[in-house]
Amino acid sequence: MESAAKIKEILQAAELEKLPDFIAAYQEDPRNGVQKLVALAQKKLDALEKEKQRIENLKKYEKEYAGYTYICGIDEVGRGPLAGPVVAGAVILPKDCNILYINDSKQLSEKKREELYDVITKEAVAWAVGYASPERIDEINILQATYEAMREAIGKLSPAPDLLLNDAVTIPGVNIRQVPIIKGCLLYTSPSPR
């Protein structure tokens, strides 16, 4: 019989997809410590299922506009700097994309943002970033500089998007259908990178 410490090591090394196997292997073990580990594994599994459902719910807009080939999510990245550029990100994800834990970047830890950045940029059909300098912000104001950064990001995408899901704005000077969504970065899975 394996020690509870060894079983704990097995759980810590187990990938999320292997949790059902872990639970099946140890659920009949009568030891208290092992049952706590099984309960922990079940809690992780329940959280994973809840996250999968949350991601599925986020696909509302992608499903609604399924007739479009390249749906792009676009958002500014931390608009409102006192000193620094305004940055906008645009991304087109594949239609079958299921990246877990995507969320508004302000809702994520720095570590999780970095992990998701790596996954998103690897999985994306296309992604790009646009910038407007502090000097440009001073010239045209923060909102116009944000639009400029967004247009730059959109212009860098290849393939070009045929639909934009925007976080609460309509970007002037863009001849692509736009759907401005209030709190958009929380409501669809095509986020901007970082």
Whereabouts are the PLM-identified features?
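Long amphipathic N-terminal alpha/beta scaffold segment
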Residues: 46-83
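Short pre-catalytic strand/loop immediately N-terminal to key active-site residues, enriched for Gly-Thr
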Residues: 72, 178-183
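Contiguous, small/hydrophobic- and glycine-enriched helical/loop subdomains that border
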Residues: 70-77, 81-161, 168-170
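Conserved small/polar residues in nucleotide/adenosyl-binding loops
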Residues: 188-194
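Short loop/helix-cap segments at secondary-structure boundaries that form the rim of catalytic
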Residues: 170-176
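Conserved catalytic/binding loops enriched for acidic/polar residues
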Residues: 6, 13-61
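Structural signal for conserved beta-strand scaffold positions within catalytic alpha/beta enzyme cores
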Residues: 129-131, 180, 189
